[in-house]
């Protein structure tokens, strides 16, 4: 810092001296310091204009005086010009301007342009540019530093953690990254940090698990910035940590890693991902430069990725304007021999035009090179050694040459600049060697002495070598020291010789070939072919480029001559595109350019297309359309090959009807040519479909011919119908359906071929011959053509015609499956003769399960049909059609061939539906269409909803009457439905008998035709094959009988609740999967138990916010039903009904539920009063564990939703604070949850915050993830204590006295305890004012001394300087109080003390701030503050984890014996646990507690705790708790079964449970916790080691012993 001060101080002096001094030659010496000073002050011209700089200095002085009043005089004195006083210079060199303290600023700290902090931010930006030339494009207007204590603290903690882990210093070093954001996002990012999910880039990792930041400050988005663009950039301070390099996912080498899901996940033990190819990006316009230069930061927490990486901290925000006046270079061909390609090591888009040595009088200075981004040539050829001998002052040079020549903005284009009759061009001079810094020394000398190197050139030219500072415009300032020189060439004559196109045309006129008039009219073919050729660039090395052009030129000609395809139209020329620097929105992939250029240079014939070839293509496509109407259609069919199918359907029909009309026949006939043409079309189609050769070409054109059948005009179809009503082909109208893939109609069409009948063809031929004969002039050629087209040599030829069919059906899934009939896919169906009554189906060929969708089944399977000469006519299938609503007469019908050809043919099938047309139900359809068709041979699919009326069956099949089909599957269906209805009816009867409310939500299963099966699926069959309900009931009945016999043998009478009379009801309950167990058993959970018994304190509460008042117990069994039976080992007469019991039941709002269960009511009525009262008392204490919660969120977030769902599942209820305050009871507790990141901005917006703080039953928690709630690792907010903030009226000397202040501080000292600290926070300006008054006023000095005394006791704190301490503001402001409340989040209360009359008190209380006077605070402290100490009053103890050791448990017992409440939402586990103690046990415990005290009591407790833990561990190992018959007590206990807890995770309060000898917990429930703590039984007690054998629980012992022998329930 001292060095920096020494370098800055002389600059300041020199600048002031230059302003005060004169000009002329004296002004040349301090030119360089003046320039530096102007840079430091934010800019200024080089001429030494003093006006703007003095104004800026005055403003800076006022700014410093405004923020630091104590330095006003010093700053003013420093601002005065001193002149040339040499003695003061050493003193000023040692002076250092103090930096502004960031800790005393708000979130945003604006920086003044020209200040040192502003320059530091600019240096960060400029040093992070990818291209140094970006300095001239970015203009930064405003800058603000970001001060976020929370994020900075986390950043420091992260560094400390990494350093503790042994990371290297290189990994811990700080650097900077950048992110361009919208204005509205700045506030959120600076307050909360950068959250994951902010980017859509996936190159380096998943954006949902990390954040992406830009490495370079000039590469902020994927698309280049446009001129005039504005934006905001957030500068982040980053710590890269351990970096992992990621291969480019688009490269071939990392294809496997791209396919792997783990490739996008963050890497453990790392903090950052970068791209392997990042070093290859050397230009802003490089391909994928933005993606490959990103940083990817992430951080792992305990078991998941953090939402905000801590090693990324916002540092500053700057606003910029992008100005891009530089035009895109027109890459002209070089005219100089010393021009070579761009030097890619420096910049990809900078042309290196000359390399050589720079000499000074023959002495080598450095190795340099000349480069330019706009110009590709030098105006003159330079020698390899450039010797410069002349030096000139810049001021003298500007007197001879206009100053505008020395402005860098003048040279923005690729051409020479003409100014004042001089042609000039500018280049950059870069030092090429990395050894030494000779050019830097040269730069310093030129800048310091304001000199210019001059080199005279030939042709009356000059070369000037200048410093970058000498090329700055007067309205700009150089911000970064540049290490390059500028080379300025000046000539009196132009040096750029650009040959225009006009000159070329004049000198070498092109010859215009003959017969090119038509070609020149459609020169658009060139653009069309070149656009289409872009698709072939990937294979440009394997094919000839001219052949690709020929292909697309031919296609263009086809479009132009009416082939039916959309004609290509060249886009109109837009001159505005020439002004744009970037024509495309994103960089294009130009990796193929090098190969193309190489081929273009060394194989130019590949890029040539001769005029002769072009004429051939033109004439070929022009003549191709001029076919004769009587000629064959082979040529037209070849054009429509497989790749042209999508254009062949409708366009051909138009061509065939329009083109022949344009041709003039040489014969003038009177017959109707159109009608003859239509007949020939029909004959040609018949020839191709019936009598054609089975050669490959004929097979190729079949799809085309099928479509030609549809292209016939309306009158021809009518003619065909009238001439052949029932025997010939019925042509169906083509429905206007959309064309599917490859031009095929998506409808299910089945075109049926006629087997051929000589009579049909002869009738057609005779009619045509007769029409020709009746013509006025007989046309022999036409007649011969017709005969040739027919191909008829004899009538017997038609009997030997082969049948061939090839159907292509496109079947897609129906979007309306419920509206369409079911379809069936059949394979390998062999049809028998007419006499065969069976339809055989190869079951092995169809193996798709019924649940498989149609899209999962292959659609290219073939149905092989073996034709038989005796097949019956398809007209016999009157009940069969493609769809029940489609009649058979609309389809293609064909008569059966009379030939004996047995050749097997193949028919392509794609999910052809087989349903009955007249069937009324799926069952009828199934019976009509198949025999022996089990579900194993049927595939249920869906049918296309666009099936038209013209679709029909194309296969002859045998229709078997429905009566002949056995209905095996219907038997299964009826059996299952019968059992289902029987089971449902029995369940309903049992539920009604027990008065259990239920909702029947199970609908009767519907068996469709394709879902019928002989038995259920394997999974269901294996689980339902046995009568599990009956077996369960029998086992339970047997077990209960064993228990009764065992108990009777011991002479213990049982209560009526479990007598044999109730065995039937118990068995009925067991049939539903319920268990009737004793309350002494530990096999069930008691999440919701006996709440109605303790509801007398809850009359005013909302029933929706409390636990359910059910007495049922949830069982963790398949049916999850609830039932409970309470038993007792005491012999109580049946008529003993105690008054306390009736009283408690009467108070319950849910007494109807209890009275509705007679067994439970009888048992409760027979309980002893003491036992029942103990139960009620314990249930009341259990009610204290009912925790309501409220999640405070300003915006919906996934985390809050997850927490809400989790807490709701645990049985907690959500409650708004206002609702809680209105209807709360003494037992209610509320937990307010807020995200830690929202504390600073939203904690004060919690409704009723002041009132909530007063209540001890309200606690606050700050969370970062769901695990914080599960593991109780959240931050406890507003724990205890508080702090006071006062205004100037409290320390006003006219009001306050020393005695009153001492009383107040004494009261504050008594109030503050280690558990609840109180503190008085005083603003800095008040202390400063007391210091100033203390020089003259003894009272102020005494007050200040008293405050200092208590400041040492940490009862008084002087706040650091911040915005409130300004002289123009009144402290404290509302924002200041809110910020202090968030910063001191552990202190519960904030009190604003004032002696003024506050009008808007509600504005303070709404933000959680208590407003009071000093007297009111001391006298009414309890009413103002309420709860504030966790020890002296009822408090919310910290949640005890599952792994607390014995020492921490025993230490809790040493605290005060006040009642404590557990505010845990899941109470250490997920379900509350209850213990029930009898009166005997309570008396024994009470006696032991009274008899022990002091150290003995603590020792006994510790011994008992230790023994209890030992016994529990041993019992857990044995899987089952054993009963100690010699030392037991009548303790009945209800436990609750959790979902998936660990046995080691037991709450600390579980040590205060009943004697370990009475713990009866099975293996299934051994991991559950008991939450009985001090509030259950009042004071801590020691566990008794002796028990009376007379009170042994025989019933429980017998039940457990019998369950060990045989337990069907397990």
Curated annotation (Swiss-Prot):
It is found in: Nucleus; Chromosome. GO terms for molecular function: chromatin binding. Belongs to the TASOR family. Disruption phenotype: Embryonic lethality with robust developmentally delayed phenotype observed at 8.5 dpc, progressing through 9.5 dpc with full lethality by 12.5 dpc. RNAi-mediated knockdown in zygotes results in formation of multipolar spindles and increased ratio of arrested or incorrectly developed embryos. The modification N-acetylalanine is found at residue 2. Residues 652-671, 697-710, 923-934 have a biased composition (Basic and acidic residues). GO terms for biological process: anterior/posterior axis specification, embryo; constitutive heterochromatin formation; mesodermal to mesenchymal transition involved in gastrulation; protein localization to heterochromatin; transposable element silencing by heterochromatin formation. There is a cross-link at residues 581, 816, 825, 866 (Glycyl lysine isopeptide (Lys-Gly) (interchain with G-Cter in SUMO2)). Residues 1-96, 631-671, 687-710, 915-941 are annotated as: Disordered. It comes from Mus musculus. Component of the HUSH complex; at least composed of TASOR, PPHLN1 and MPHOSPH8. Interacts with MORC2; the interaction associateS MORC2 with the HUSH complex which recruits MORC2 to heterochromatic loci. Interacts with ZNF638; leading to recruitment of the HUSH complex to unintegrated retroviral DNA. Interacts with INPP5A, EML1, SV1L, GPSM2, ITGB3BP, CNTN1, ETFA, PSMD8, S100A10, MPHOSPH8, TMEM100, ALB, PARPBP, HCFC2, NCBP1 and SETDB1. Its main location: nucleus. The modification Phosphoserine is found at residues 339, 628, 631, 668, 793, 836, 921, 1059, 1508. The keyword Kinase does not apply. Component of the HUSH complex, a multiprotein complex that mediates epigenetic repression. The HUSH complex is recruited to genomic loci rich in H3K9me3 and is required to maintain transcriptional silencing by promoting recruitment of SETDB1, a histone methyltransferase that mediates further deposition of H3K9me3, as well as MORC2. Also represses L1 retrotransposons in collaboration with MORC2 and, probably, SETDB1, the silencing is dependent of repressive epigenetic modifications, such as H3K9me3 mark. InterPro entries: PIN_TASOR, TASOR, TASOR_ab_dom, TASOR_DUF3715. GO terms for cellular component: heterochromatin; nucleoplasm. This is Protein TASOR. The keyword Phosphoprotein applies. The gene is Tasor. Present in skin, brain and testis (at protein level). Ubiquitously expressed at low levels in the majority of the organs, expressed at higher levels in kidneys, spleen, thymus, seminal vesicles, uterus, and ovaries and its expression is almost six times higher in male tissues than in females. Highly expressed in seminiferous tubules with a strong signal in Sertoli cells, spermatogonia, and spermatocytes. It comes from the Eukaryota. Keywords: Acetylation, Chromosome, Isopeptide bond, Nucleus, Phosphoprotein, Repressor, Transcription, Transcription regulation, Ubl conjugation. Coiled coil: none annotated. The modification Phosphothreonine is found at residue 1004. Residues 52-61 have a biased composition (Low complexity).
């Amino acid at each position: 810092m001292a060095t920096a001060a020494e370098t800055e101080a002389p600059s300041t002096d020199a600048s002031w001296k230059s302003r005060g001094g004169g000009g002329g030659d004296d002004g040349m010496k301090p030119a360089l310091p003046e320039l530096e000073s102007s840079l430091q002050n934010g800019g200024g011209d080089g001429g030494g204009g003093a006006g703007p700089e003095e104004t800026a200095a005055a403003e800076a002085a006022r700014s410093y005086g405004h923020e630091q009043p104590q330095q006003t005089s010093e700053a003013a004195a420093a601002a005065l010009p001193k002149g040339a006083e040499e003695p003061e210079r050493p003193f000023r060199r040692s002076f250092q301007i103090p930096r502004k303290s960031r800790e005393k600023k708000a979130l945003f700290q604006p920086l003044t342009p020209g200040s040192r902090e502003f320059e530091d931010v600019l240096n960060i930006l400029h040093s992070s540019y990818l291209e140094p030339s970006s300095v001239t494009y970015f203009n930064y207007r405003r800058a603000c530093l970001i001060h976020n204590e929370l994020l900075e603290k986390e950043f420091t903690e992260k560094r400390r953690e990494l350093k503790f882990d042994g990371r290297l210093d290189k990994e811990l070093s700080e650097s900077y990254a950048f992110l361009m954001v919208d204005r509205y996002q700045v506030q959120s990012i600076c307050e909360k940090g950068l959250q994951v999910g902010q980017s859509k880039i996936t190159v380096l990792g998943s954006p949902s698990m990390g954040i992406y930041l830009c490495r370079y400050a000039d590469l902020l988005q994927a698309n280049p910035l446009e001129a005039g663009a504005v934006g905001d950039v957030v500068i982040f301070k980053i710590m890269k940590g351990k970096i992992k390099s990621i291969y480019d996912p688009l490269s071939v080498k990392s294809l496997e890693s791209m396919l792997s899901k783990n490739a996008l996940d963050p890497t453990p033990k790392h903090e950052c991902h970068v791209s392997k190819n990042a070093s290859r990006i050397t230009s802003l316009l490089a391909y994928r430069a933005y993606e490959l230069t990103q940083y990817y930061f992430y951080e792992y927490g305990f078991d998941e990725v953090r939402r905000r990486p801590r090693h990324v901290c916002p540092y500053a925000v700057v606003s910029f304007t992008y100005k891009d006046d530089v035009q895109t270079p027109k890459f002209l061909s070089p005219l100089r021999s010393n021009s070579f390609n761009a030097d890619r090591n420096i910049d990809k888009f900078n042309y290196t035009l000359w390399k050589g040595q720079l000499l000074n009088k023959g002495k080598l200075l450095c190795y340099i090179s000349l480069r330019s981004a706009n110009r590709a040539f030098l105006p003159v050829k330079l020698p390899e050694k450039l010797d410069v001998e002349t030096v000139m002052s810049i001021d003298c040079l500007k007197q001879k040459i206009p100053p505008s020549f020395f402005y860098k903005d003048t040279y923005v284009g690729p051409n020479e600049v003409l100014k004042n009759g001089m042609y000039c061009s500018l280049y950059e001079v870069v030092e090429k060697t990395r050894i030494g810094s000779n050019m830097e020394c040269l730069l310093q000398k030129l800048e310091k002495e304001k000199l210019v190197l001059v080199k005279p050139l030939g042709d009356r030219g000059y070369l000037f070598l200048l410093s970058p500072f000498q090329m700055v415009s007067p309205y700009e300032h150089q911000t970064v020291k540049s290490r390059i020189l500028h080379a300025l060439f000046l000539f009196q004559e132009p040096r750029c010789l650009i040959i225009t196109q006009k000159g070329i045309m004049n000198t070498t006129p092109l010859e215009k070939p003959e017969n090119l008039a038509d070609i020149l009219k459609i020169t658009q073919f060139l653009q069309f072919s070149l656009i289409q050729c872009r698709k072939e660039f990937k294979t440009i090395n394997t094919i000839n480029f001219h052949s690709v052009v020929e292909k697309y030129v031919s296609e263009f000609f086809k479009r132009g001559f009416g082939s039916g395809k959309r004609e290509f139209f060249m886009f109109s020329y837009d001159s505005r595109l020439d002004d744009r620097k970037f024509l495309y929105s994103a960089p294009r992939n130009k990796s193929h350019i090098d190969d193309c250029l190489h081929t273009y240079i060394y194989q130019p014939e590949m890029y040539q297309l001769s005029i002769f070839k072009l004429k051939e293509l033109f004439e070929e496509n022009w003549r191709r359309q001029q076919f004769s109407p009587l000629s064959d259609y082979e040529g037209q069919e070849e054009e429509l090959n497989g790749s042209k199918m999508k254009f062949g359907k409708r366009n051909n029909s138009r061509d065939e009807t329009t083109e022949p009309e344009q041709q003039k026949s040489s014969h003038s006939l009177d017959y109707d040519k159109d009608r003859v043409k239509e007949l020939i079309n029909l004959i040609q189609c018949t020839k191709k479909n019936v009598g054609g050769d089975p050669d490959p070409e004929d097979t190729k054109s079949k799809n085309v011919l099928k479509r030609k059948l549809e292209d016939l005009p309306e009158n021809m179809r009518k003619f065909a119908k009238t001439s052949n009503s029932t025997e010939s082909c019925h042509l169906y109208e083509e429905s206007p359906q959309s064309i599917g893939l490859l031009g095929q109609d998506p409808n299910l069409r089945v075109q049926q071929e006629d087997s051929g009948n000589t009579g049909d063809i002869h009738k057609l031929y005779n009619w045509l011959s007769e029409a020709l004969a009746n013509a006025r002039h007989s046309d022999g050629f036409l007649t011969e053509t017709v005969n040739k087209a027919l191909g008829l040599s004899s009538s017997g030829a038609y009997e030997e015609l082969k049948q061939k069919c090839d159907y292509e059906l496109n079947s897609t899934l129906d979007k309306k499956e419920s509206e369409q009939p079911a379809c069936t896919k059949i394979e390998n169906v062999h049809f028998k003769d007419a006499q065969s009554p069976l339809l055989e189906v190869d079951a092995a060929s169809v193996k798709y399960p019924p649940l498989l969708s149609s899209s999962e089944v292959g659609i290219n399977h073939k149905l092989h049909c073996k034709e038989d000469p005796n097949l019956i006519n398809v007209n016999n299938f009157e009940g069969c059609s493609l769809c029940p609503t489609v009649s058979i007469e609309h389809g293609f019908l064909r008569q059966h061939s009379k030939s004996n050809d047995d050749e097997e043919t193949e028919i392509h099938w794609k999910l052809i539906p087989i349903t009955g047309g007249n069937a009324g139900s799926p069952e009828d359809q199934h019976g009509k269409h198949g025999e022996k068709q089990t579900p194993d041979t049927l595939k249920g699919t869906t049918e296309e909803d666009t099936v038209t009326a013209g679709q029909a069956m194309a296969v002859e099949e045998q229709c078997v009457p429905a009566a002949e089909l056995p209905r095996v599957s219907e038997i299964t269906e009826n059996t299952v439905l019968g059992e289902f209805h029987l089971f449902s009816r029995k369940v309903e009867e049992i539920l009604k008998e027990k008065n259990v409310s239920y909702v029947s939500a199970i609908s009767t299963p519907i068996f469709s035709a394709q879902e019928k099966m002989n038995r259920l699926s394997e999974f269901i069959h294996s689980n339902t094959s046995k009568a599990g309900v009956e077996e369960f009931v029998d086992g339970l009945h047997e077990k209960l009988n064993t228990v009764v016999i065992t108990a009777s043998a011991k002479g213990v009478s049982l209560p009526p609740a479990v007598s044999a009379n109730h065995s039937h009801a118990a068995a009925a309950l067991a049939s539903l999967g319920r268990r009737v167990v004793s309350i002494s058993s530990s096999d069930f959970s008691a999440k919701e138990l006996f709440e109605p018994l303790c509801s007398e304190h809850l009359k005013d509460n909302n029933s929706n916010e409390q636990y359910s008042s059910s007495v049922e117990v949830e069982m963790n069994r398949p049916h999850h039903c609830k039932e409970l039976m309470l038993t007792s080992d005491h012999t109580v007469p049946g008529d003993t009904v105690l008054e306390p019991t009736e009283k408690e039941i009467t108070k319950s709002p849910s007494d109807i539920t209890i009275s509705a269960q007679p067994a439970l009511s009888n048992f409760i009525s027979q309980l002893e009063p003491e036992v029942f009262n103990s139960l009620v008392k314990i249930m009341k204490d259990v009610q204290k564990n009912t925790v309501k919660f409220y999640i405070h969120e300003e915006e919906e977030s996934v985390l809050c939703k997850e927490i809400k769902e989790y807490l709701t599942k645990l049985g907690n209820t959500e409650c708004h604070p206002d609702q809680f305050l209105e209807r709360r009871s003494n037992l209610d507790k509320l937990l307010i949850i807020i995200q830690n990141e929202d504390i600073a901005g939203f904690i004060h917006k919690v409704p009723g915050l002041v009132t909530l703080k007063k209540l001890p039953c309200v606690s606050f928690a700050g969370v970062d993830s769901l695990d914080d709630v599960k593991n109780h690792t959240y931050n406890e907010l507003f724990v205890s204590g508080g702090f006071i903030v006062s205004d100037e009226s409290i320390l006003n000397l006219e009001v306050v006295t020393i005695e009153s202040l001492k009383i107040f501080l004494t009261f504050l000292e008594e109030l503050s305890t280690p558990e609840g600290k109180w503190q008085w926070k005083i603003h800095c300006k008040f202390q400063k004012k007391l210091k100033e008054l203390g020089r003259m006023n003894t009272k102020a000095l005494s007050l200040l001394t008293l405050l200092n005394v208590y400041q040492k006791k940490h009862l008084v704190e002087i706040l650091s300087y911040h915005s409130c301490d300004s002289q123009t503001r009144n402290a404290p402001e509302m924002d200041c109080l809110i910020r202090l409340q968030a910063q001191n989040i552990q202190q519960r209360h904030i009190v604003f003390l004032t002696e003024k009359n506050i009008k808007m008190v509600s504005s303070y209380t709404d933000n959680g701030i208590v407003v009071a006077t000093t007297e009111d605070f001391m006298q009414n402290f309890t009413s103002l503050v309420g709860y504030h100490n966790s020890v002296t009053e009822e408090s919310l103890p910290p949640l005890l984890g599952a792994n607390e050791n014995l020492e921490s448990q025993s230490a809790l017992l040493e605290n005060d014996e006040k009642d404590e409440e557990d505010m845990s939402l899941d109470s250490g586990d997920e379900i509350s646990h209850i213990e029930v103690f009898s009166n005997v046990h309570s008396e024994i415990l009470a006696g032991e507690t009274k008899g022990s005290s002091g150290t003995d009591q603590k020792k006994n407790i510790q011994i008992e705790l230790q023994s209890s833990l030992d016994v529990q561990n041993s019992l857990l190992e044995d899987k089952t708790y054993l009963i100690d018959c010699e030392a037991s007590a009548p303790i009945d206990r209800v436990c609750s079964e959790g979902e998936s807890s660990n046995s080691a995770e037991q709450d600390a309060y579980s040590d205060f449970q009943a004697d370990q000898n009475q713990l009866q917990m099975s293996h299934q429930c051994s991991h559950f916790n008991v939450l009985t703590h001090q509030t259950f039984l009042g004071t801590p007690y020691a566990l008794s080691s002796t028990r009376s054998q007379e009170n042994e629980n025989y019933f429980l012992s017998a039940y457990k012993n019998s369950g060990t022998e045989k337990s069907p329930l397990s």
